[in-house]
């Protein structure tokens, strides 16, 4: 793990990229690793995100135990992220950023949120449902999905994130919030731990408010 972090830092120093990207960006990533109370962040250049999320096949189970096809999300813009429920610090900060976005919008303009688990072996529907309750993520507007293991690499490519098994059952992963358009394509991404609420709000208004969802 230390060797991987050292390599990332070397890349930052050699390319001049910031260690913690800010704002809504394309094609770069802030790597966040958590083990216990420890966080590390580094920047690593990446290609723009891959295939549309809604074109990814696989088995996705939501917090209520329903099997979902990502193609069913096509037609309505949404905000996507990736978390895992045992994450001690990075993921709660991501969820807090999503709540800030939600509170900044009138009820009728608020997005649908889709959060993919990076720890499907542990994050069963029951665990995801408990997490949703404690984090105030009410269905159906907040959808927490447990992907099958084979689908995770495609999800990571679509969101533009990197992840790997960490220490003590943790997951080293990129902190990312993505704005997804009605075709299922990631249009813009906010990366790293230094979230920019104004930029995220502007991106949603520009891309996501082409369709409205009914209030909860």
Give the label of every model feature segment.
Residues 1-57, 210, 216:
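N-terminal targeting signals for export/organelle localization
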Residues 166-216:
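Thiol-/selenol-based redox modules, centered on thioredoxin-like
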Residues 69-98:
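Short active-site neighborhood of thiol/selenol oxidoreductases, capturing the structured segment around
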Residues 93-155:
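Structural microenvironment flanking redox-active thiols in thiol-disulfide oxidoreductases
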Residues 57-78, 102-105:
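A short beta-strand-turn-helix
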Residues 53-55, 77, 172-174:
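Short, small/polar residue-rich loop motifs at catalytic or cofactor-binding pockets
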Residues 103-107, 133-137, 157-161, 185, ...:
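Sec-exported extracytoplasmic/periplasmic mature domains
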Residues 141-142, 153, 157-166, 170-178:
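Structural micro-motif
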């Amino acid at each position: 793990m230390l060797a991987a972090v050292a390599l990332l830092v070397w890349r930052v120093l050699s390319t001049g990229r910031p260690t913690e990207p800010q704002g809504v960006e394309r094609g770069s990533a802030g790597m966040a690793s958590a083990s216990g109370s420890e966080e590390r962040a580094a920047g690593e250049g990446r290609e723009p995100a891959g295939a549309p999320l809604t074109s990814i096949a696989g088995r996705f189970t939501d917090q209520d135990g329903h099997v979902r096809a990502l193609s069913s999300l096509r037609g309505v813009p949404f905000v996507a992220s990736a978390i895992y429920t045992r994450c001690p610090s990075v993921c709660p900060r991501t969820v807090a950023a999503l709540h800030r976005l939600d509170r900044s919008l009138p009820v009728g303009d608020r997005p649908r949120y889709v959060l993919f688990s990076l720890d499907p072996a542990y994050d069963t529907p029951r665990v995801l449902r408990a997490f949703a309750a404690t984090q105030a993520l009410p269905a159906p507007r907040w959808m927490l999905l447990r992907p099958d293991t084979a689908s995770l690499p495609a999800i990571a490519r679509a969101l533009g994130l990197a992840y790997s098994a960490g220490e003590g059952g943790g997951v080293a992963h990129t902190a990312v919030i993505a704005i997804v358009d009605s075709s299922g394509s990631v249009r813009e991404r906010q990366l790293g731990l230094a979230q920019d609420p104004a930029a995220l709000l502007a991106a949603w208004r520009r891309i996501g408010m082409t369709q409205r969802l009914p209030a909860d």
